[in-house]
Structure formats: structure tokens, C-alpha cells
Amino acid sequence: MESKTYYATTTKRFILRTKHQDWLVETQIFYNEILAFYYNLYLKMSDFHEEGGQRVMRELEKLTIVGRDKQEVLYPLPWCKVPLYFRRAAINAAIAAGKSYLSRDEQQQRTQTFTKSVTFYKGMYRNLNEKSVELKVWSGEMWTWLHCRISGNVFSKGEEQLSPSVVLKEKQAELHVPVKSVVSDGRKAKLRIQDQEKIAAVQFINRDRLAVIAILDAKGNQCAVHFLKGGTVYERQCQKILTAIEKSEKATGYEESHHSNKKYWMKLKHLNEYYSHKFSKDIVEYCNEQQAGILVLPLYSKTYTKYVMNAVGNWSVLHLSGQIREKLKYKAWKSGIIVLETEAAGISSKCAVCGQKIQKNGTEYICKEGHRGSRYLNSAVNLGRKCLKSFEKQAV
């Protein structure tokens, strides 16, 4: 029996240049008009709401597109000669938007207008490489092929390119290309535990030492430890920008400075992106060095997470840890490491050596038996062992 092949999908961003930027704008406007049409139709048809995406698409097309039998349809599409795959991309986006609206606890007013980026399905783009791409676009009068130059990234060997999207930003256009690559190891966690693989348990410290990674063997013994540094550098750079924003607001007033400070807010966003990518990459690389096949993260309640995140603000090291977690999930998977989340309850209150209750003193701890050390490392070890025990219970 052949083993199953597993894949990871990530998105690569390119800067896109063309002589006809206005055609890209026209194409996006047209795309969103079609999207809005199908969004409202989908919400109107309550019978479709529990169906899968492909089934819903077929039903929506039956209601809007005249078939080979030339029979009239109930809701004819109010535009002529819309390319098949352009229409289907808009329908898929409309279904996703409709399902999102219906899933909200409190359904507010429906979206009236959309500004979604255009996804170009097969047949709507061609000759995609690292330097250029041809896109089928709407000029405002006709459909035409538009040659575009792209730069700023590369495709790796073995990657399969999927349907790209054109993202229009204030100062530039970007081409976002999803790429699919084979994952070296896609085994489930249970099999990895059975194969006695090491696990890496992460506890976020949210100081200069941003996180601690404890490597445990299959029996829960600590094999190695690594402290990830850099939190102070990140906070210092963020604070420098926030100070500049504060000075600008005092000098010109909030309303006037809000627009002029946009470049500063973008710098903060880019800092967050850069460091969350960097630190998540560092964690994955350390796991690979230690041959750990499972990465364990602490899981907190949504209420607790929301409360804490609101209290610390968007540019703290603690808030950065949330971005690191999200990036770890796909970076680790791409590297053949599986990510698990284990309930954090109880991991910080007992000694990992003897199980006695601990007393905290800053970043350190001490227990009744005299064991002492980093309370964050102690929590990481407890987290890893708690994860291992959960698999023992499953095996019983």
C-alpha cells in the first residue's frame, strides 16, 4: 500500500507592475459587482446554506446562467460575456462571504459593497514565472490579456503554483501566489508518539527572553532547553515609533496627524510581521536540530486570551507571541513537524521535578523540596508531560 502524500500551502508575494494599472482597478470593480450579486442571491436561497461549496456553485449557476437548453433562468446575470472562471472565482468568494455572515452570533447588516482582491483561476492567467505573468483583465470595455512584470520573490524547486490573486494597495499592486509543496513527514501525532519521537514544548515568557523551548524524550525526560531572545529589541523599536506618533498627535492634533502617521503605523505592522516570522522560524529550526517531531503550545481559554491581549495592547511582546503561534502552525507543518495545543491549566503551579506546589519569585520558582529554577522552563516541561499523558489515556 502506497503511503499518503501530504502537502503544505503557503503564499508568496510579488510586486506587480504594468502600464495599465487602471485595468486592474476596473477588473476588481467588476469582480466585486458580480460577487455582491451572488452574495445576495446566496443569502436569499436558504435551502443552500447547509450545502457544500461546489454544490452551491452549481445551483447558483443554474439559477443565473442560461444552459444549452436555452431555457430562461430565474435570476439572469445582468452582465454579458463574463468569462466562466472569472465568474466562478467571484461565486466562490460570494459563498465564503455569505457563510461568514451566517456564522456570526449577531447578524448585523449585510455587506453592501465589496473590495475583495481578484483571484485568477486557470484560464484567466498564463505564463506565470518569477519575472512576469499575463492576466486576462477587463479594461472597462473589453476583455484583454495584460502583460505584467513581477519581482521581489522566487519559486522554489518542486513547488506547485496555484491560482494567484492581484492585491491593489495604496502605492503598489501585488501578486499573491499560493504554492503547494510536499511535506516530508505528515504522520499523525499518535504515530509519532508510538515511534518514541522527541517533543518540543514551548512556553512564552514575553520578556527579552521571548520563549523557552523544552525538548523531552518519549518518557518525558528533559533532553535540551533553549531560550529565545529578542523581545526587548522588538519592544524598543515599537516604542520608538509609538513615541513619534504621540509627538505628532500632540503637535497637530489627532485628526490631522492620523493620515500623516499612516507610514508609522505601517512600520509597526511590518515590524510585527518581520519578528513573528523570524522567531517562528527560529523555533522550527531548533526543533529540527533536536529532531523533535511534535511541537506543543499552551492553550488558554478564549476569554482569558482576549482579556490579556486587550490589556497589553497591540505592540507588546505578549501580543507578538500570538502572531508567532499562528505562523508556527504552518511553518512547522511545512517542515514535517506537527503542532499540538494542550490545556495550560496547572502547568505553572507545580514543580516539574517532584510535583509539589511552587512559590514564584519573579522569573524563578522554588518548591517545598528545595527544587528551584526558571518557572517558565518548569511550565514548559509540565506542558510537554501533560501532552504525553493525554496520549497514554487514549491508549488505555
Outline where the language-model segments fall:
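Stable alpha-helical structural segments in soluble proteins, enriched in small hydrophobic residues
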Residues: 30, 34, 89-101, 377-387
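Broad gene-expression machinery/nucleic-acid interaction feature
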Residues: 11, 130-134, 145, 172-174, ...
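Short alpha-helical "patches" and their helix-cap loops
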Residues: 48-55, 107-116, 299, 396
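Generic hydrophobic, helix-prone segments enriched in Leu/Val/Ile
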Residues: 8, 34-38, 60-61, 124-126, ...
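Intrinsically disordered or highly flexible coil/loop and linker segments, enriched in small
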Residues: 40, 44, 103-104, 289-293, ...
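Acidic carboxylate diad motif detector
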Residues: 57-172, 180-182, 226
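Gly/serine-rich nucleotide phosphate-binding loop at the start of the catalytic core
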Residues: 1-92
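Positively charged, helix-rich recognition surfaces that bind polyanionic ligands
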Residues: 176-396
